[in-house]
Amino acid sequence: MKKLLSGFLAIMLAFTLTGCGKETHELQIGQVLGAAHGTKCFTVTTVVLEGETIVDVVIDEFQYMDSTTTTGVPNSENFKTTEGYHLVSKVVNNETYSANMASKGGATMEIAAGYKAIEDFCIGKTAADLEGVDAVSGATLVDTAGYVAEVAKAAKAAAETEAVTYEGSIEAGALKVVLGAAHGTKCFTLTAAYAVEGTVVLSYIDEFQYMDPTTTVGVPNAENFASYVTDGTHLVSKRVNNETYSNNMATKGGATMKLADGYNAIQNFCNGSAVADLEGVDAVSGCTLVDTAGYIAEIVKAAK
């Protein structure tokens, strides 16, 4: 009887320990700017990575288009662009852009569907797996190879970032990217969040603003956008130009924190938090950015 009881207890203990075990995932996020499709637009590609494997991807592109038939990026009405044109997201303007592709180039696939096919193809692969890939089943976009190369580049960028640990299944995880206006009227915010069942696991913030081309690095293809900008500036990523932008903040506003450090502090605060817990938060310890509440609200928006 003792032997039987001992064996039963051992089995139950093993079962209990197995049942208590949780999946553990080490995840990273990266975002890159590129020129996957010609000279009239720039690409923003965001990747979530586990180890070397791509977990999720979002691709979008930005181009100047007719302001009477498209929706501009947030604050576009305040940007000094050529009359009749403004900067747009192709994903946001999927139907209009796709109709143009169909009428002018005979395209049979909507741009967003093409992006999605490429994103789905890349998920589960490594950057090395994507090297040299020039075609994707189900994607008829002419520059498919360029988009795949941008995903590989974003995966490599993600590998250089600090990982976060998530305990539990990520089967329901989803990466979303949203546009907003977290900081005034002179720029627009691009915010990514990877969320699992109401929890922000990873987040990423960047902003885009028109600045002096002699002291900053423009977005890819910025030199080809000059005819659309009327005040001699060009569009830049604030992260890419962190040093210059932060120096301006310090000189003009007395800022004591670099912009990218502020973004990162907000991201670190939000990562691991329930979306509901972030609603209405307006301050983050260690972050002195004046519009902290706005950035958190954008992460919440992306997570939803």
Go through each PLM region and give its residues.
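C-terminal motif of bacterial Sec signal peptides marking the signal peptidase cleavage site
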Residues: 16-19
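Positively charged n-region of N-terminal signal peptides that target proteins for export
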Residues: 1-11
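Short, surface-exposed loop and linker segments with low hydrophobicity and enrichment for Pro/Ser/Thr
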Residues: 6, 21-25
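Active-site- and interface-proximal helix/loop "cap" or "latch" segments in soluble metabolic
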Residues: 24-29, 33-173, 181-304
